[in-house]
Amino acid sequence: MDAIKKKMQAMKLEKDNAMDRALLCEQQARDANIRAEKAEEEARSLQKKIQQIENDLDQTMEQLMQVNAKLDEKDKALQNAESEVAALNRRIQLLEEDLERSEERLATATAKLAEASQAADESERARKILESKGLADEERMDALENQLKEARFMAEEADKKYDEVARKLAMVEADLERAEERAETGESKIVELEEELRVVGNNLKSLEVSEEKANLREEEYKQQIKTLNTRLKEAEARAEFAERSVQKLQKEVDRLEDELVHEKEKYKYICDDLDMTFTELIGN
């Protein structure tokens, strides 16, 4: 009887130990499940962060492409502005050359007119001198008449030359007026061109400032891309570590569940053994 009691006490102690181990296994399994759930939650959070970083990277790349496109447009605008400035400079040079030629033609016509006027004045003075003298001498009269004829001829020639010069002078004056109008137009155009050049210069300065700002933004975008790539790699590494941790915890959970099943089977075996022992005691 004492042996049976000792055996029952030993079996009860073993049962209690099995129960304690089973409870411990269950607690360890619950703890492992909690750690696994936390690891999975952290993995999901990391996945969301990775997705957000990838979206930020795509947005930054798109902004960088837009900045590069704007820089290309500004480069084209700058080239067009430089071409316009060169064309305006050529037009100004042509206007200045045309004005110089008109001034030279005006000076030549003025000199010819002065010569013709001087010749006409000299002929008129000679004619008046011949008329005032009233020479009685026939030969002298003939000579004077001849001189007068010559003077008249010279005067007529001078008049013709004067008319020709006057006609040419009128043409020159008309050309001069047109040249002056063109000069005034050219001056106005020069003022406009200078204003356009000033505006183009300001635009060029603005483009240079915009280009510097665009370069700074491009450097900032590159730095952001670099930072995002670094964060992406870190997040991927953490995600991989979390996945490995989840797998490790899952293996631990599986092991504890197997151990729990084994302890439950052992506990069942002890209970069955106790039942058999009680049955034997009752039967005896």
Curated annotation (Swiss-Prot):
Coiled-coil ranges (or none): 1-284
This protein's record includes keyword DNA repair: no
Disulfide-bonded cysteines: none
Pfam families, per database record: Tropomyosin (PF00261)
Subunit structure: Homodimer.
Domain notes: The molecule is in a coiled coil structure that is formed by 2 polypeptide chains. The sequence exhibits a prominent seven-residues periodicity.
Functional note: Tropomyosin, in association with the troponin complex, plays a central role in the calcium dependent regulation of muscle contraction.
Protein keywords: Coiled coil, Repeat
Organism from which the protein derives: Blattella germanica (German cockroach)
Name under which the protein is recorded: Tropomyosin
Protein family according to the UniProt entry: Belongs to the tropomyosin family.
Keyword Oxidoreductase assigned: no
